[in-house]
């Protein structure tokens, strides 16, 4: 393998999402990059970097990276090519400077997307009732089968992680319009203010990596002295209780000592660019 620079000029890039079937023109979007402090960039086929969206939330950390308080901001991005939606997740400061989670859906050109967002739809009401904390905030998102999965850290409150009436420490599933999915395991009605309507799986500490493969949901959950990789099954409690040992519960693989995974992807067996021994595998970024 060889590492090379594909595009540059980013400030604290935090997530990336590739257009599944990009256009052929030099100015057609190829992939999107989020910057931690609040800009969404789009890179075109000719490797020009454009600003797709900015100034859609307020955040002024007490200290900049590598300080703990500087870890907060724009965290995840996922694409819905059928509808031309670009979803981004982030933590922001409200009018009282309280840190909260949120998600915004940007409307773009279906299929190939566009260089600028046409409009924006915030999903604030789903998340606004519960404050969050630096680093244990909302995480990545993933579009699958006309639904959107999104992870949330426990906000440094392990008791809320295992409470299905809290959004913290969860994998959530919603429609592209931000509504609950009726087949979610704890769904009771369409009330967007009831966290249990959205819960797919629970009992996580800081699930900052997410990938859906053939309908199976995989998560890397950052722990105290160890991390875990697992399949997040529908309705299952992953038992984070504030202790080191609980991170190993229900894990498919334990990473010890902790490395703090921040991104994850899966390379399918059907793609032949990688050598055969590297296909059909997950890749975690630490």
Task: Give residue ranges: language-model regions.
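Loop-centered beta-sheet repeat module
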Residues: 165-174, 183-214, 218
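Active-site rim elements
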Residues: 157-160, 194-201, 208, 247-255
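A structural motif
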Residues: 142-148, 174-182
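Acidic/polar, solvent-exposed loop segments in beta-strand-rich repeat domains
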Residues: 157-166, 237
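Beta-strand initiation motifs
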Residues: 1-2, 47-52, 106-124, 179-196, ...
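Acidic, Gly/Ser/Thr-rich repeat motifs that build Ca2+-stabilized beta-propeller blades
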Residues: 1-159, 209-212, 216-222, 227-229, ...
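Beta-propeller blade signature
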Residues: 100-114, 164-177, 231-234
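Glycine-centered loop/turn motifs
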Residues: 235-236, 280
């Amino acid at each position: 393998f060889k590492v090379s620079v594909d595009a540059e000029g980013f400030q604290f890039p935090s997530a990336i999402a590739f257009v599944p079937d990009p256009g052929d023109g030099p100015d057609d979007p190829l992939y999107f990059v989020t910057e931690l402090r609040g800009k969404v960039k789009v890179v075109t086929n000719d490797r020009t970097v454009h600003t797709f969206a900015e100034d859609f939330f307020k955040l002024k950390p007490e200290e900049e990276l590598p300080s703990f308080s500087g870890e907060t901001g724009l965290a995840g991005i996922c694409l819905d090519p059928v509808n031309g939606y670009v979803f981004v997740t982030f933590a922001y400061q409200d009018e009282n400077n309280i840190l909260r989670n949120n998600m915004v859906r940007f409307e773009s050109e279906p299929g190939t997307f566009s260089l600028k967002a046409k409009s924006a739809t915030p999903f604030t009401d789903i998340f606004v009732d519960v404050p969050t904390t630096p680093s244990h905030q909302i995480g990545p998102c993933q579009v699958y089968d006309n639904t959107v999965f999104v992870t949330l850290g426990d906000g440094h409150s392990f008791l809320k992680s295992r409470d299905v009436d809290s959004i913290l420490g969860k994998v959530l599933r919603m429609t592209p319009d931000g509504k609950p999915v009726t087949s979610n395991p704890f769904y009771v009605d369409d009330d967007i203010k009831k966290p249990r309507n959205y819960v797919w799986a629970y009992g996580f500490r800081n699930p900052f990596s997410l990938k859906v493969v053939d309908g199976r949901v995989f998560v890397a959950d950052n722990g105290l002295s160890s991390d875990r990789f697992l399949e997040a099954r529908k309705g299952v409690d992953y038992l984070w209780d504030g202790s080191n040992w609980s991170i190993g519960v229900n894990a498919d693989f334990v990473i010890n000592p902790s490395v703090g995974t921040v991104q994850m992807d899966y390379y399918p067996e059907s793609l032949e660019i990688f050598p055969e021994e590297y296909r059909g595998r997950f890749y975690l970024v630490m």
